[in-house]
Amino acid sequence: MIKTLIIFVLLLDSFAVEAQSSNSSFIQPSADQNIITGADRVDVYLRYLKGKKIGIFANQTSVVGNTHMVDTLRKLGINIKVIFGPEHGFRGNADAGEKVGNYTDEKTGIPVISLYGQKRKPSPEDIQDLDILVFDIQDVGTRFYTYISSMQEFLETALENHKPLLLLDRPNPNSFYVDGPVLDPKFRSFVGMQPVPINYGMTIGEYAMMLLGEKWLSEKANAVNAYNITTNPTPDTPFHFLVIKCKNYTHKSKYILPVRHSPNLPEIQAVYLYPTTCLFEGTALSEGRGTTKPFEYIGHPSLPKNMFAFTPNPNEGAKSSKHYGKICYGWNLGGTPAEVLRKVDGKIQLKWLIEAYAIFPAKDSFFARPEAFNRLAGNDVLMKQIKEGKSEEEIRKSWEPKLSEFKLIRKKYLLYDDFE
């Protein structure tokens, strides 16, 4: 018999302070310094971990202040039995797409199970001896960044095996707008598992609530979730899914990531541009991998030589990529955070992609990886529209019906004041 389970978002006044409204424009150079992440609220969630055997999904972004979450919990006497690692690995030093194996972490001696290697989802055997699962990873709010897919697989595993999951919410640095084509289910992959736009404007906690509420999980996980009761959890009252909210955060808030997010998202400017410039991964153009400004430099050796020039070379974040050792010509989209925000202007910017195709001399080879481009776009329509010379306005208009539908769904699951 399925036991009664509890899905709960921590909202009690004694535990949480509701997000405060901000009157500032989303285009501002300074970060909101008073934001407290879910992970930082140790006093709220420690009670649920004491005396338990823990499995934690974490990477280098899992910090409490200046200390890694794993170190924080171990110092507090929490028994971490296993660490699960996402794309780029637990320590965040693997290339994009690089398969990572299982190993024992040298610093802590704790086994690390990779969920971006031979498998993407924990097995029942991986978690059978655990009392509770914890998820604490900083996301960037973009559909094709794989951490939301990893979170979904982790959540499904928890539900399917009746293990409580504690999710420590973190701000989304790209949550100040919602834009892009909504994914066509025919193009479902690990870089896009659900019918959401490229930039969906939700924290990972809100996104998880949407997965639950819209029944977008596996059949078994959805069936288990149907038995939930919303109530106030205590150490003696089991919950099945618990979100620890951020404090002093809204979807207008500016949040500068305290830790480099991945080898190819080394600074906030790259994070802001990523929803737009990652589409270039499916083209013949370099997206700046192998430079100090990945996703800020865009170019190709055959573009006009009076354009911005850069030369990709192997580095920590890109051991192999496009056009190594060749001078590429194109765009430097970087600048200060405020300047980049003005360039992004709260939407997916298609103008660089459209212009690049227009001036590219060998049109037939522009979309060098068509299947990859379609997976990133979430459809096969965008490529056709660009080839047909459609304007940005025409393309954006084609997104609107599905985008409007998604915005209504999104609103149901927001835990923080919205940007509009």
Can you say where each PLM-predicted feature lies in the sequence?
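Glycine-rich oxoanion-binding loops at beta->alpha junctions
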Residues: 101-130, 142
